[in-house]
């Protein structure tokens, strides 16, 4: 898998560092995945992992690693993972060039 196929922005990496610090575990990695559901057919999910799975692709920004499983990878190739703060709250977002439609909340999409 191409290591440049997904990008984690500096803002997202900074937030991951803050969350790792608050958990007291510098080995945590951000896992990004796609599941069926949501109002547009697919939903994005985020959680932390202590170690990669055998089929994970790893993407790096400085000392921050992002993991994507092989099934989710096909839906996320070319995407940018960012972190935004605004009036609507703070959250990780994905700018996905493969999505043909995106839900207003930004966490659901279709291809």
Curated annotation (Swiss-Prot):
The protein's name is Iron-sulfur cluster insertion protein ErpA
| Function, as annotated | Required for insertion of 4Fe-4S clusters for at least IspG.
Keyword Metal-binding attached: yes
User: What molecular function does GO assign, one term?
Assistant: 2 iron, 2 sulfur cluster binding
- SUPFAM superfamilies reported for this sequence: HesB-like domain (SSF89360)
Q: Which GO biological process entries does UniProt record here?
A: iron-sulfur cluster assembly
Subunit comment: Homodimer.
Entry keyword annotation includes Membrane = no
Cofactor requirements of the protein: iron-sulfur cluster
Give the organism the record lists.
Answer: Acinetobacter baylyi (strain ATCC 33305 / BD413 / ADP1)
For this UniProt record, the keywords arranged alphabetically read as follows: Iron, Iron-sulfur, Metal-binding
Q: Which domain of life is it from?
A: Bacteria
For this protein, the record's InterPro entries field holds:
FeS_biogenesis (IPR000361), FeS_cluster_insertion (IPR016092), FeS_cluster_insertion_CS (IPR017870), FeS_cluster_insertion_RrpA (IPR023063), HesB-like_dom_sf (IPR035903)
What does the similarity note say? Belongs to the HesB/IscA family.
- Cofactor binding note from Swiss-Prot or TrEMBL: Binds 1 iron-sulfur cluster per subunit.
**Residue numbers binding iron-sulfur cluster:** 39, 103, 105
């Amino acid at each position: 898998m191409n290591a440049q196929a997904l990008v984690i922005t500096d803002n997202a990496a900074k937030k991951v560092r803050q969350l790792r610090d608050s958990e007291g575990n510098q080995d945590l990695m951000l896992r990004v995945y796609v599941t069926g559901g949501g109002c547009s057919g697919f939903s994005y999910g985020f959680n932390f992992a202590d170690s990669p799975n055998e089929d994970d692709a790893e993407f790096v920004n400085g000392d921050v690693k992002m993991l994507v499983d092989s099934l989710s990878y096909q839906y996320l190739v070319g995407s940018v993972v960012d972190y935004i703060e605004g009036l609507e709250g703070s959250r990780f977002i994905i700018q996905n060039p493969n999505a043909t439609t995106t839900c207003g909340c930004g966490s659901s999409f279709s291809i």
